[in-house]
A protein has these predicted regions:
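Sec-dependent N-terminal signal peptides
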Residues: 3-13
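Short, low-complexity N-terminal intrinsically disordered segments enriched in polar/charged residues
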Residues: 16-49, 53, 160-161
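Surface-exposed, charged secondary-structure patches
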Residues: 23, 60-61, 69-119
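N-terminal, post-signal-peptide region of Sec/Tat-exported proteins
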Residues: 42-70
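Residues that flank catalytic or metal-binding motifs in active/ligand-binding sites
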Residues: 55-57, 95, 126-128
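A mature extracytoplasmic/lumenal domain signature
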Residues: 65, 110-114, 128, 145
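A short, polar/proline- and glycine-enriched secondary-structure boundary/capping micro-motif
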Residues: 72-74, 118-122, 151-158
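Short beta-strand edge/turn micro-motifs at domain boundaries
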Residues: 125-155
């Protein structure tokens, strides 16, 4: 029985590693993972492990909310309020992307919408400005900044055509 459990554990770890490797080997993969870790139904538990794997050590997060209040902190500090399961469902989805890449660095302007369900109207929109670098055969998120839409709408160049 122990042998069977050990084999199952090894298979699940290898599967997780393969999935994570796919997530970070392309810009598409890492940006998709970036949104997947925060989105889920009521009771969803934030995917801390994947979030740690997509961010570089010491990655910095900067956020301007809809009132233009400023926050700047580390990924570890971002995790603190997410320790409990979600009280309501939350889906943050990418609606448009502008990517600029040169060598081992890339910058992604990612317009997002937040919704209570995947088929509901967004209750909030904004732009994530995501800085990436490629090292050791994979992409890393070095930093990201978020600006929630307020009185100033998201510019048309960052919206779907």
């Amino acid at each position: 029985m122990k042998k069977v459990l050990s084999i199952l554990l090894l298979l699940s770890i290898n599967s997780f590693a393969d999935d994570t490797n796919e997530d970070v080997s392309t810009i598409d993969g890492i940006i998709n993972a970036y949104y997947e870790v925060v989105s889920g139904p009521k009771g969803f538990i934030f995917d801390f492990e994947t979030d740690r794997l997509i961010h570089a050590p010491n990655a910095i997060i900067t956020r301007f909310n809809e009132n233009n209040d400023f926050q700047r902190h580390t990924v570890a500090e971002e995790h603190e309020p997410l320790l409990e399961p979600y009280e309501t469902s939350l889906y943050e989805i990418e609606v448009s992307r502008v990517c600029q890449e040169y060598g081992n660095i890339a910058h992604v302007w990612s317009t997002f919408a937040m919704m209570e369900t995947l088929d509901s109207e967004p209750f909030l929109r904004g732009i994530n400005s995501i800085s990436l670098y490629f090292k050791d055969g994979r992409w890393w998120i070095a930093s990201w900044q978020t600006q929630y839409e307020s009185d100033t709408e998201v510019p048309k160049k960052y919206l779907p055509n």
